[in-house]
Amino acid sequence: MVKQLKFSEDARQAMLRGVDQLANAVKVTIGPKGRNVVLDKEFTAPLITNDGVTIAKEIELEDPYENMGAKLVQEVANKTNEIAGDGTTTATVLAQAMIQEGLKNVTSGANPVGLRQGIDKAVKVAVEALHENSQKVENKNEIAQVGAISAADEEIGRYISEAMEKVGNDGVITIEESNGLNTELEVVEGMQFDRGYQSPYMVTDSDKMVAELERPYILVTDKKISSFQDILPLLEQVVQSNRPILIVADEVEGDALTNIVLNRMRGTFTAVAVKAPGFGDRRKAMLEDLAILTGAQVITDDLGLDLKDASIDMLGTASKVEVTKDNTTVVDGDGDENSIDARVSQLKSQIEETESDFDREKLQERLAKLAGGVAVIKVGAASETELKERKLRIEDALNSTRAAVEEGIVAGGGTALVNVYQKVSEIEAEGDIETGVNIVLKALTAPVRQIAENAGLEGSVIVERLKNAEPGVGFNAATNEWVNMLEEGIVDPTKVTRSALQHAASVAAMFLTTEAVVASIPEKNNDQPNMGGMPGMM
């Protein structure tokens, strides 16, 4: 494909036009009085949202140079979303401010490399100051405040707070679409996997069609059980203990399944057979998780173990197991705490190392099941458009809340960035490095300025007053009042604010040091000649 090139000022100005188009579409959403953006969807109803990264991902510009500029800011939003899960609009506003101010200085003759050094220096000091001003999230109310501010909805904050209280900070909280109008919270305690009983005759409660096992033994194996004789010695030991047994195997079939059902119906013993969860390597890993949680030994050929030789001390135990047609839930497994903690640490390491979003999601689910449970927030709304918008807001709020628990909180509404202004202004530098520091100083005020403008106020007036205010005191754009942001619960997670600033600075520095841009020339579709026809035909 043929390429076209642009150099120096021409290249940067073309990319700046793309930056501005994307940033201008995103920044109208920031703050409590921010607006929504409507996104056209080819095969479904339009999506109405105020989620920065969702808007940024939709933007594709016709001009290749402008599109490259837009893609750079998209990268800021994506990276911030990936690391912190929220703050994408703030990151976009910061990036635009740094790029615009930096480009003015480059055009005036400043050296981009010196500017980059100044930007890096200023951001390092700003991040250190943010951490100094950060406060730990201590209780349920503070967690609810973070969620409520992010979603602009107190009810959502409350749901997230309750969910985190029940499943722990490492617990999985999933967001699903509900068929009703109301949003609800449902918590599944213990380890649950999506496999049910292999025969309805195994149920203990025929009204609910549920098998409930109290203090059961748990057999965990990756083998297929076809012969009843293979497990008979083990079942005889279980019968003597007068306790039920849950059999988790690759499959229980034929003679083995028939005899388990017959003995259950005769009242000889209570046994429930379920298929092992997952597939392939993931199945082995999930069986190991279950074994560690319950204190069982996985009966597998990999370890040279055979079902005929299995003894009762190879079985796991739990306080309760509930099996439905579709799911099995193991509550309060009796596994060794140290082994469980070691497994949790191992999973956390794998989550950090993996580059696949799908693998990360599955690892997080496994971590949650070991750590305590799964909470499901079922989102309800009156229309599909409202449902999708509400779901996006809840996802952002959940990510914000997790970030707050991890690194603490700072004053919200852009106040935290202005609070570090003084520290950054004290940096001693000269020449282009000093100019780079000044670029960051101006950008630190950009989010507050935009929040004020979205509320119909003069941003410059708000910024100047905020610079002279006590640390933590800020402008509440929802009520047009000056308040102590932390006391009022108007907070941002430190991680979100930090990530937004760092990623914006990184992309701005790359932009300013760009001297040439190479783009593909779009191929023109030549009109196809008319097909020749028979005489007399058109």
UniProtKB/Swiss-Prot annotation:
One of its GO terms (molecular function) is ATP binding. InterPro entries: Chaperonin_Cpn60_CS, Cpn60/GroEL, Cpn60/GroEL/TCP-1, GroEL-like_apical_dom_sf, GROEL-like_equatorial_sf, TCP-1-like_intermed_sf. The keyword Coiled coil does not apply. It comes from the Bacteria. GO terms for biological process: protein refolding. Its EC number is 5.6.1.7. It catalyses: ATP + H2O + a folded polypeptide = ADP + phosphate + an unfolded polypeptide. Keywords: ATP-binding, Chaperone, Cytoplasm, Isomerase, Nucleotide-binding. Pfam families: Cpn60_TCP1. ATP binds at T29, I30, G31, P32, D86, G87, T88, T89, T90, G413, N476, A477, A478, D492. It is found in: Cytoplasm. Its main location: cytoplasm. One of its GO terms (cellular component) is cytoplasm. It is an enzyme of class 5 (isomerase). Forms a cylinder of 14 subunits composed of two heptameric rings stacked back-to-back. Interacts with the co-chaperonin GroES. Together with its co-chaperonin GroES, plays an essential role in assisting protein folding. The GroEL-GroES system forms a nano-cage that allows encapsulation of the non-native substrate proteins and provides a physical environment optimized to promote and accelerate protein folding. Belongs to the chaperonin (HSP60) family. This is Chaperonin GroEL. The lineage of its organism: Bacteria, Bacillati, Bacillota, Bacilli, Bacillales. The gene is groEL.
